[in-house]
Amino acid sequence: MYLNEGDQWHRRPLHLEVLGYLRKEGVYAATAVHAVAGFLGRHNVETAHIVDAGGKLPVIVTFVDTDEHVNRVLPTLKEMAAHRLIVRENVVIEQGNLD
């Protein structure tokens, strides 16, 4: 999920709300990474070097789980981040497991 640091859900930071939702739903692993720079579409590149980027710096939320679990949580994530980019990829777990 590609979010902005200023995005909110019920007056709380969206990335934290997404992580809380995923935790509550028992998703295996999730993380939010604050980017130092980025852009979306035709918008300007925003960087962390700007004193006040106006909440436009990217925050990327990534999570890992089975297809079935992703299918179950995805509708709510689409609602929470209706205005943002959500990307889905199939991955191969090289080490560890989802137990």
Regions found by a protein language model. Name each.
Residues 1-99:
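Positively charged, small/polar-rich N-terminal and surface patches that mediate targeting and assembly
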